[in-house]
Every structure is written in structure tokens, then in C-alpha cells.
């Protein structure tokens, strides 16, 4: 494990970058600022290492990043309609930071904070954060850890664990943007994807709040049950894609055993020879094709733009806390929040 400076935050605190490597030539870097996944170096079919996630060279880029490159999102990922929810008869008001809704817990997300480092060794780093009662509008003192592990099986494991002294809402995720040709390779539309999902969550309008329906993907451009290029139907004359400018939808995973870590997606790049398998124990995944990446200069001076990376964000159904019939992301006082998402690389 290598530790080095990653720049100084705007309030004068030093951020650190931790680099882990395995026996097969893979290498990942993570920072204590926002518990971001900064880089994932994977050997391609010719043995050349490619960095397959978008990001920045120092903490400064992450402080102003609105796209959440590599971010740990908390307390709640995705959207909450009306930026409010009711729990045990009490209404909790959150920040309205996208339209009239709350996105990724508001402008003071966990990805804009300096985390403590609890443990670091050659294969894993654990970041810890205390989120006090009322933080972002959520109830309860929530203590959470995020552990990044790089295995010799070429898997990046992200393990979340936390507890709270009151019942609260917790639905954390990682917002990495992947480009299996390399972060500097431009469009991801020729890369292929399989999603282990026969249903998706349609949205009401361009504000991207779900209708509450679980709609079949079959016969629509939302069908990724067999391998398909991301860009094959992204501009199709299909209302759901028009509303969101391309893919940015929740997919309900076909789980064999509820709560078990199972395959959720397989993405591949023929040009690099790199394949990524993604696994989670959560019930859903948000597939986002990077439709609204704001033009920005990233790592090594590379210019990022629309659809230069895609996200596979494991999660509960977005806005489930406000919808009847959905599994709600409620962490009860004294219980343990415990979930794992894995991105495994084949090269």
C-alpha cells in the first residue's frame, strides 16, 4: 500500500490518496476525501494498463464536481420526491437540490467530506464517517464505514457497514463512471452491457421520479438481458429515453436469493479486451449512461464530456421511502447496515 498527499481542501485540510495493488498488475487508488474511488488500473489485452474510471488528479476537482465521479453517496443515493419523507408519523425535510427533489442527499453529501482512515493495509482501506442527528435532514447519529478491497481475483470490493441510534433512511452507493477503453477514450456507446434485470422503473417526467410501476424491459430499448452496445438504442424514439436524455433508470434485479451477492451486470470493451462483472446484495441497480456529464477537465488533462463513462449504482428502488409496496431502505436503531458491491475485472 502506498500513501501520498492528494492536495489541500478549501478549508485547509490535507487529503490523502491510498494506492493498492495485486499480483496481477491491477492497481486502485482511493482518497479519504469523500471516500472516492479515484483510479482503477487494469491491464488490457496487450498488457498495457488502462485507467477505467473517470476522476481528478487532486482533491480540488472533487470539491467542485457535480457529476460525483467515483463518489461514496450517502446517506441516501438517488432521488427523494419533494425532498421530504415521513417516518413514524414525522415528516423530515431535505434540501431541494434538483428541481423540487432531493438528489444524492443534497449539496452536503458524504462525498464532499473528509473521512477518517480507520485501517489500511496492502489490500484494503477503511474510511469512517460520523453523520450526526439531523445531518442533511435525516434522523439519528449514523456512524458508517466504507472499505475498499482489491483482491487477487481482480475484484474491487466495496463494503458498507453502519449503525444508528434512531430509525433512519440509509441507501448508500458508489457513483463511479466506468470506461473500459480507458478514462481518456471518449464515448462509451460502443461498449456492451448485460443487465440481470427483466424489469425497470419508469419515470414520470424529466425530473426522474419513478411512477411506482415495475415495467417489463422485453420489447423495449431498455432490454439488456442479452449483450447489447450501450449506444445501440440510446437515441431510440422511446418516451422513457427521451425524458432522461438516454439511459438513467433503475433496474430491478432478478435475484435468486434475496440479500445474497449476485451478478447484476456485465460490461465489455472489445477494443481493450477488458470485461467487468458487477455484483451486489441490493435489489436494484441504476444504469446511467453519463448523459449529463458536464464538460470538465479530469485526470492527466483529459477532457470529459457527455457519455464518456457509465455508472452501475447498486441501490434500493429510488424514492421507495415514499412509495407503497416497495422495500424501504429503513435502518432500525441498533441494527447494522451491511451491504457489499463488487466490480470484478477480466483481462
Regions found by a protein language model. Give the residues of each.
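An exposed, glycine/acidic-rich loop-and-rim segment of catalytic or binding clefts
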Residues: 1-347
Amino acid at each position: 500500500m502506498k500513501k501520498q498527499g492528494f492536495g489541500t481542501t478549501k478549508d485547509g485540510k490535507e487529503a490523502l490518496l491510498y494506492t493498492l495493488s495485486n499480483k496481477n498488475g491491477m492497481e486502485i487508488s482511493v482518497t479519504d476525501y469523500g471516500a472516492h474511488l479515484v483510479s482503477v488500473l487494469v491491464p488490457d489485452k496487450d498488457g498495457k494498463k488502462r485507467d477505467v474510471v473517470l476522476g481528478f488528479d487532486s482533491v480540488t476537482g472533487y470539491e467542485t464536481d457535480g457529476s460525483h465521479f467515483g463518489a461514496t453517496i450517502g446517506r441516501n443515493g438517488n432521488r427523494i420526491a419533494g425532498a421530504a419523507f415521513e417516518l413514524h408519523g414525522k415528516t423530515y425535510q431535505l434540501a431541494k437540490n434538483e428541481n423540487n427533489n432531493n438528489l444524492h442527499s443534497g449539496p452536503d453529501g458524504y462525498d464532499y467530506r473528509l473521512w477518517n482512515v480507520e485501517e489500511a493495509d496492502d489490500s484494503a482501506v477503511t474510511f469512517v464517517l460520523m453523520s450526526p442527528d439531523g445531518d442533511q435532514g435525516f434522523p439519528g447519529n449514523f456512524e458508517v464505514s466504507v472499505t475498499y478491497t482489491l483482491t487477487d481475483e481482480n475484484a474491487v470490493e466495496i463494503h458498507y457497514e453502519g449503525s444508528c441510534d434512531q430509525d433512519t433512511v440509509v441507501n448508500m452507493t458508489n457513483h463511479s463512471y466506468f470506461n473500459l477503453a480507458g478514462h481518456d477514450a471518449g464515448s462509451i456507446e460502443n461498449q456492451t452491457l448485460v443487465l440481470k434485470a427483466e424489469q425497470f422503473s419508469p419515470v414520470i417526467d424529466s425530473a426522474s421520479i419513478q411512477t411506482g410501476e415495475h415495467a417489463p424491459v422485453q420489447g423495449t430499448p431498455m432490454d439488456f438481458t442479452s449483450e447489447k452496445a450501450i449506444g445501440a438504442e440510446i437515441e431510440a424514439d422511446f418516451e422513457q429515453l427521451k425524458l432522461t436524455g438516454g439511459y438513467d433508470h433503475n433496474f430491478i434485479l432478478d435475484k435468486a436469493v434475496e440479500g445474497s451477492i449476485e451478478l447484476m451486470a456485465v460490461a465489455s470493451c472489445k477494443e481493450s479486451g477488458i470485461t467487468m462483472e458487477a455484483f451486489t446484495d441490493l435489489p436494484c441497480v441504476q444504469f446511467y449512461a453519463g448523459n449529463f456529464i458536464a464538460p470538465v477537465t479530469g485526470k492527466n488533462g483529459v477532457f470529459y464530456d457527455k457519455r464518456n463513462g457509465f455508472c452501475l449504482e447498486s441501490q434500493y428502488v429510488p424514492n421507495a421511502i415514499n412509495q407503497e409496496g416497495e422495500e424501504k431502505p429503513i435502518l432500525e436503531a441498533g441494527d447494522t447496515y451491511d451491504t457489499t458491491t463488487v466490480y470484478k475485472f477480466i483481462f
